Amino acid sequence: MYAVIKTGGKQYKVVAGEKFKVEQIPADIGSEITLDQVLALGAGETIKFGAPLVAGATVLATVVSHGRHDKVKIFKMRRRKHYQKHQGHRQNYTELQIVSING
């Protein structure tokens, strides 16, 4: 069984037991969180779509770790004007492990 969930403004296709990284969620490591924005559920050939959410469907996940992604370098330049700007960014993330999909 799989589910399509929405968290942090993005959509993820998840399966029970899978680990994946999402935008930072303020939760302690080891705590269980419930993701209730389930957009679709699937099992084999049957697929259940929500409009926009599947009623009564939830995904239970455990917080594995918090961290930061690799640095993204931003370089801006105006030709012939001697203008150069360097900038970097590291986005925070939370790693989750899916415990169960209910619905």
UniProtKB/Swiss-Prot annotation:
Molecular function per GO: rRNA binding; structural constituent of ribosome
Gene Ontology process terms (BP): translation
Record InterPro entries: bL21-like (IPR028909), bL21-like_sf (IPR036164), Ribosomal_bL21 (IPR001787), Ribosomal_bL21_CS (IPR018258)
UniProt entry tagged with the keyword Metal-binding: no
GO CC annotations, alphabetized: cytoplasm; ribonucleoprotein complex; ribosome
UniProtKB keywords: Ribonucleoprotein, Ribosomal protein, RNA-binding, rRNA-binding
Superkingdom of the organism of origin: Bacteria
PROSITE patterns: RIBOSOMAL_L21
Signal peptide: none
Family the entry assigns: Belongs to the bacterial ribosomal protein bL21 family.
PANTHER family from the UniProt entry: 50S RIBOSOMAL PROTEIN L21, LARGE RIBOSOMAL SUBUNIT PROTEIN BL21M
Subunit structure: Part of the 50S ribosomal subunit. Contacts protein L20.
Function: This protein binds to 23S rRNA in the presence of protein L20.
Full protein name: Large ribosomal subunit protein bL21
Organism listed in the record: Janthinobacterium sp. (strain Marseille)
